[in-house]
A protein has these predicted regions:
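N-terminal glycine-/serine-/threonine-rich phosphate-binding loop
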Residues: 1-46
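Short beta-strand segments at enzyme active-site cores
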Residues: 8-10, 44-56, 98-100, 132-134
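Short, active-site-adjacent cap segments at secondary-structure transitions
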Residues: 15-17, 52-56, 108-109, 138-140
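Short acidic, glycine/serine/threonine-rich loops at helix termini
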Residues: 19-21, 56-61, 111-115, 142-146
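Charged helix-capping and loop-helix junction motifs
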Residues: 25-29, 114-118, 146-151
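Glycine-rich loop at the start of a catalytic domain that most often binds anionic cofactors/ligands
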Residues: 52-69
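Ligand-binding beta-strand-loop-alpha-helix segment within the catalytic cores
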Residues: 65-140
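Conserved small/polar residues in nucleotide/adenosyl-binding loops
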Residues: 152-160
Length: 160
C-alpha cells in the first residue's frame, strides 16, 4: 500500500455493544489492530461509531430500551463518555490518540457547521489523530429513535 487512501470504518451498535461493561472490547481491540496496520501503511482512517445509548443503558442498569426521548438522550450522554474512553484507551496502547467528534443532523444541514465539522476532522487527520465520529444523540430528536446515521459524506471532498 504505497498510495495513501482515506478509510472510513462504520462500527454499528450491534458490533460495538457487548457484555463487557456494555461494550464489545474484543471487537474494538480487533478494530484498533486493523487500523494500526492501515496507519503503518500510510493510510488515513476515520471511525464512525455507534453504541452510546447501549453503553449508557448498561451503565445506568436499564435493561429495556426506553421509549422516552429524554431517557434515551440521558443514556447517550452517559454512554458517550464511556465509549470515547474505551476507544482512547485501546488506541493509546498502540501509540495513537483519538478525537471525539459528535455530529447532529443540524450540523449537516447547516453549511457553515458542516464545513466546520469537516475541517475539524481533516485537522485531526493532519495531526495524526484517529477521529471517532458519532451522532450527538444527547441532542438528537427523532433520529435517536431510528439509530445512527452514516456521516461518511463529511470525509468527501467539498467545494467551499
Amino acid at each position: 500500500m504505497n498510495k495513501s487512501y482515506k478509510w472510513v470504518v462504520k462500527a454499528g451498535s450491534s458490533l460495538v455493544s457487548g457484555n463487557q461493561d456494555g461494550v464489545n472490547i474484543d471487537f474494538i481491540s480487533q478494530l484498533a489492530s486493523q487500523i494500526d496496520f492501515l496507519r503503518k501503511n500510510n493510510q488515513e482512517v476515520i471511525v464512525i461509531s455507534s453504541g452510546a445509548v447501549a453503553k449508557g443503558m448498561n451503565d445506568l442498569g436499564i435493561k429495556k430500551r426506553p421509549d422516552q426521548l429524554a431517557i434515551l438522550q440521558a443514556c447517550a450522554a452517559v454512554g458517550q463518555r464511556g465509549i470515547s474512553e474505551i476507544y482512547q484507551n485501546t488506541f493509546e496502547k498502540l501509540g495513537y490518540t483519538t478525537g471525539q467528534v459528535l455530529i447532529s443532523h443540524d450540523d449537516i444541514a447547516n453549511r457553515t457547521r458542516y464545513l466546520n465539522a469537516k475541517n475539524a476532522i481533516e485537522a485531526l487527520l493532519d495531526l495524526g489523530v484517529i477521529p471517532i465520529v458519532n451522532e450527538n444523540d444527547c441532542v438528537a430528536t427523532e433520529e435517536i429513535s431510528f439509530g445512527a446515521v452514516s456521516y461518511t459524506h463529511l470525509t468527501l471532498p467539498t467545494k467551499a
